[in-house]
C-alpha cells in the first residue's frame, strides 16, 4: 500500500495516528536542525517534518529531495506549532520516520504553483506539469462535476445517452471540416463531425424521443478565446416539442447547474430578447446585460449640422457611461485608438461630457450649438458627470458592432462586468438566412435544418430575407453558452430550404439524401439544443479562455505544442493512403 491517506485529508482529530502518504515534493526548506517538506497530491498539501536530532541520516536524505520528486513517507500526525490557515491541513504536520524515493525529477521549467512563473507557451509544452497546479486541476474537477450533474438531470427527464459516429461524411455548409483519408477507399475521405446534427435528427426518426450526448465536435476555423478546433457539446434533441418545450427544459437545466455548481438560486424565467432588438440596442446577438449603456440612435439629432463625418453617415449611435465625465484627454485618446484598431475598424470617436451645471461639452462643439447638445443629453437621459461616446459609419450593422466593442471596453474599465454576477437571457427570432458577400448568396444563419417560424413560411417565395427562424440561443454574461432550434421535419419544406440556399436537387440528394429519405418514413416534429460544455465550465470558473478548462488544449494557432501536432506524415503512410502532398506557395 502506497498510502493510507491523501495529502488533503488529515486533520487535528488525526493527531498521533501513524500514516503513510505519497505524492510530489512541492517545496522544501531547512531551518536549523529541521527540514520541512510540503508534499502535494491531487487532494492538497501536507507538511512533513524531518528532525536531525531524531534521525540525522533520514534528515540528510530529505535535504537532497528536489522539487517534484515522487516520494512515499511513513510518519506520525502531530499538531502543528505554527498553523497555516490557508490550507485545510494547516493544523497538522507529519513527523517522518521513513522515506522512500519513488522517482526523482529534473528541475521543472516553471514553478508548479498557483501563481506560476511559466508563460503560456511553456505551460502548453509541458501541460502535464501545468495540470499539477491546483488552479488548473480544479477546472477539470469542476468539469467532471458538471458532466455528472448533466447526466443525472437529463436521465431523470427520460433522456437516453446515445453515442453517434465520429467518422462521418463531409458537408460544406458551415465551418470547414477536418477530414480523414480512408485507406480502404482510396481518394475518399471521412469528416470529423462539427456537431451530431443530422445523426440526432435520425435518432428522432428512429423513435428515440429524448436523446443526449456529451459529444466531441471538430471545426477547422479561426481560433479565439472561446474557440478550440475540438470542443465538447452537451448535445440534446427531443421529439413532439415546440420551442417553448425546449426552452423550458434547458432553462431548467441551467438553473440546476447554477444551484449545484455555484450555489446560486436563479428565480423566475430568463428574459427573452428578439435578435433585432439585441442588434439595435447592443450591436450583438449575445449581449452582456449585466450593465446598461444601451445604444441610442442619433441620426435625427446630429445629422445635417455641417460636420461631414456625421452628415455622410448612414448610422450614428452612442452610449452613455454614467459617472465617467472625469475621463482625461489621454484616456479618451486611448479609447479612440481602441475603436480604430483593425479588428474593430472605426474611423474615430466623438465624445460629450455632461458638466456639473448641466451644459454639454463635446469634441465637436464648433459644429453644434448648446441647444442641439442638450437634445443629445436628453436622448440618453444623461446627468451631470456622465460621458457620451459616439460612433458613426456608412454601414449600420458594422458600426453597431464597433459600438458593441466600445461598450464592452467601457464595461471593463468601469468594473461593470463582475465575473461573479450572472445575467442570463434567451435571444430569439433570429433571421433564418443571412447574406454572404463572399458566396454571393443566402446562407443559413444557423444550419439548413432550422425551421422557419410557421407564420413566416409564406415569405419563403417572396421575401426569404425577412423570414425568422424558430431558433433560440442562451446567452450568459455576453457568452453564447448554447443554442438550438425547432427542426424542419417535412421533406418538401426541407427541399425548399435547400433550393433557397442554392443547392441543386442533385447536390441536395448527394449530400443529405440519407436524411431526406428518412423523413419519408415518418419524421416527428422535433427540436433541440446544444450547450457548449467548455464555455459553461469557463463561465463558472471565471476564466477568460476555455483553454484552461480543457485537459490538453491547442494553442491559438491550432497546434498541440506538447505532442507537436499537426505534423507531416511519414512517406510510407502517404503512399498507403494514396496521397500526394502539394503545398501551394
Curated annotation (Swiss-Prot):
The keyword Translocase does not apply. SUPFAM superfamilies: Class II aaRS and biotin synthetases, GAD domain-like, Nucleic acid-binding proteins. One of its GO terms (molecular function) is aspartate-tRNA ligase activity. L-aspartate binds at residues 173, 219, 446, 487. Pfam families: GAD, tRNA-synt_2, tRNA_anti-codon. GO terms for biological process: aspartyl-tRNA aminoacylation. HAMAP family: Asp_tRNA_synth_type1. Belongs to the class-II aminoacyl-tRNA synthetase family. Type 1 subfamily. Homodimer. This is Aspartate--tRNA ligase. It comes from Bacteroides fragilis (strain YCH46). The lineage of its organism: Bacteria, Pseudomonadati, Bacteroidota, Bacteroidia, Bacteroidales. The gene is aspS.
Amino acid at each position: 500500500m502506497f498510502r493510507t491517506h491523501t495529502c488533503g485529508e488529515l486533520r487535528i482529530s488525526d493527531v498521533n495516528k501513524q500514516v503513510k502518504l505519497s505524492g510530489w515534493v512541492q517545496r522544501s526548506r531547512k531551518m536549523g536542525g529541521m527540514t520541512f517538506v510540503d508534499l502535494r497530491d491531487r487532494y492538497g498539501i501536507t507538511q512533513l517534518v524531518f528532525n536531525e536530532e531524531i534521525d540525522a541520516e533520514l534528515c540528510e536524505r530529505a535535504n537532497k529531495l528536489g522539487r517534484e520528486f515522487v516520494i512515499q513517507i511513513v510518519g506520525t500526525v502531530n499538531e502543528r506549532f505554527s498553523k497555516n490557515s490557508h490550507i485545510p491541513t494547516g493544523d497538522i504536520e507529519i513527523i517522518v520516520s521513513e522515506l522512500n524515493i519513488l522517482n526523482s525529477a529534473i528541475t521543472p521549467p516553471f514553478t508548479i504553483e498557483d501563481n506560476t512563473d511559466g508563460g503560456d507557451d511553456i505551460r502548453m509544452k509541458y501541460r502535464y506539469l501545468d495540470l499539477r497546479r491546483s488552479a488548473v486541476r480544479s477546472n477539470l474537477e469542476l468539469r467532471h462535476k458538471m458532466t455528472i450533474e448533466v447526466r443525472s438531470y437529463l436521465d431523470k427527464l427520460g433522456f437516453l445517452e446515445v453515442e453517434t459516429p465520429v467518422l462521418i461524411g463531409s458537408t460544406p455548409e458551415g465551418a470547414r471540416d477536418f477530414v480523414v483519408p480512408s485507406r480502404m477507399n482510396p481518394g475518399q475521405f471521412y469528416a470529423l463531425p462539427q456537431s451530431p446534427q443530422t445523426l440526432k435528427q435520425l435518432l428522432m426518426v428512429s423513435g428515440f424521443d429524448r436523446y443526449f450526448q456529451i459529444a466531441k465536435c471538430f471545426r477547422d476555423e479561426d481560433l479565439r478565446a472561446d474557440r478550440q478546433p475540438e470542443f465538447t457539446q452537451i448535445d440534446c434533441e427531443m421529439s413532439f416539442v415546440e420551442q417553448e418545450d425546449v426552452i423550458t427544459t434547458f432553462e431548467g437545466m441551467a438553473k440546476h447547474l447554477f444551484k449545484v455548481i455555484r450555489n446560486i438560486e436563479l428565480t423566475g424565467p430568463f428574459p427573452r430578447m428578439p435578435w433585432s432588438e439585441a442588434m439595435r440596442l447592443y450591436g450583438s446577438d449575445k449581449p452582456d446585460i449585466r450593465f446598461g449603456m444601451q445604444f441610442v440612435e442619433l441620426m435625427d439629432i446630429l445629422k445635417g449640422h455641417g460636420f461631414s463625418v456625421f452628415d455622410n453617415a448612414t448610422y450614428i449611435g452612442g452610449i452613455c457611461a454614467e459617472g465617467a465625465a472625469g475621463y482625461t484627454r489621454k484616456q479618451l485618446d486611448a479609447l479612440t485608438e481602441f475603436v480604430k484598431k483593425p479588428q474593430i475598424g472605426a474611423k474615430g470617436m466623438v465624445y460629450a461630457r455632461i458638466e456639473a451645471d448641466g451644459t454639454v461639452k463635446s469634441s465637436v462643439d464648433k459644429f453644434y450649438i448648446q441647444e442641439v447638445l442638450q437634445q443629445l443629453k436628453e436622448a440618453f437621459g444623461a446627468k451631470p458627470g456622465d460621458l457620451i461616446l459616439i460612433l458613426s459609419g456608412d454601414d449600420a450593422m458594422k458600426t453597431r458592432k464597433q459600438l458593441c466593442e466600445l461598450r464592452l471596453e467601457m464595461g471593463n474599465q468601469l468594473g461593470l462586468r463582475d465575473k461573479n454576477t450572472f445575467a442570463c437571457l434567451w435571444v430569439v427570432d433570429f433571421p433564418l438566412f443571412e447574406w454572404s458577400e463572399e458566396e454571393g448568396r443566402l446562407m443559413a444563419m444557423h444550419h439548413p435544418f432550422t425551421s422557419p417560424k410557421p407564420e413566416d413560411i409564406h415569405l419563403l417565395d417572396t421575401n426569404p430575407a425577412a423570414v425568422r427562424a424558430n431558433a433560440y440561443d442562451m446567452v450568459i454574461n455576453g457568452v453564447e453558452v448554447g443554442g438550438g432550434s425547432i427542426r424542419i421535419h417535412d421533406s418538401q419544406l426541407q427541399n425548399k430550404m435547400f433550393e433557397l440556399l442554392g443547392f441543386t436537387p442533385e447536390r441536395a440528394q448527394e449530400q443529405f439524401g440519407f436524411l431526406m429519405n428518412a423523413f419519408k418514413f415518418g419524421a416527428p416534429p422535433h427540436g433541440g439544443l446544444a450547450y457548449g460544455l467548455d464555455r459553461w465550465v469557463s463561465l463558472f470558473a471565471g476564466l477568460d479562455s476555455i483553454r484552461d478548462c480543457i485537459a490538453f488544449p491547442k494553442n491559438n494557432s491550432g497546434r498541440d505544442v506538447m505532442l507537436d501536432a499537426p505534423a507531416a506524415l511519414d512517406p510510407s503512410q502517404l503512399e498507403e493512403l494514396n496521397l500526394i502532398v502539394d503545398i501551394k506557395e
